[in-house]
Amino acid sequence: QTETKKILVFVPDTGNKYLSKLYNDYWMLDNGFFERQQHGDLRDLILRPYSQKDTVVLAPGDKLITAYQRMKLYDISQLPVMDGDRIVGILDESDVLLHVYGDEERFNDQVSIAMTSKLDVLDVKSPVEALLPVFDRGQVAIVTEGDRFLGLITRIDLLNYLRRRAP
């Protein structure tokens, strides 16, 4: 090398602050750094597909403390409750809070006691507009193909999808 050049090296002490985003594949997907396969249906909005084992789930017999810990660990507000490969309910922060408030021992109760079993299920071929009434009811959309659970779509998933499509 014949000419002098300056080199700037950024050496963080850890990756747990701003660089932590680079370690999070879901953040990278949402922000367009990874390409995702497009299907032309509601699968394009599912951030954590169940078929790829990306969906964080609970079983009906799991304890509410387990649900709370998973919500905290993965920074999510709701979890599908699966009996094998069949979705039987959904549990969100409000369900847990309302169940345990006033009696913290209830964290040891089973998920099946506190979960919601009235589900807003949409077929994968439903139009994106079909999500709006689900969200208007304060629910999360459960996407299926026939009887097969594909994943969840939340309000933020729809917003991220719309942002990615913006010019």
Set out the residue ranges of the language-model regions.
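Structured interaction and signal-relay segments at domain junctions
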Residues: 93-101
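Phosphate-binding loop/pocket of nucleotide- and phosphate-handling active sites
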Residues: 1-52
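Surface-exposed, flexible loop/turn segments at secondary-structure boundaries
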Residues: 15-16, 149, 158
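The conserved cystathionine-beta-synthase
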Residues: 56-75, 81-83, 100, 120-139, ...
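Bateman (tandem CBS) regulatory domains
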Residues: 40-56, 107-119
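Glycine-rich acetyl-CoA-binding "A-motif" of GNAT/NAT acetyltransferases
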Residues: 87-90, 128, 149-152
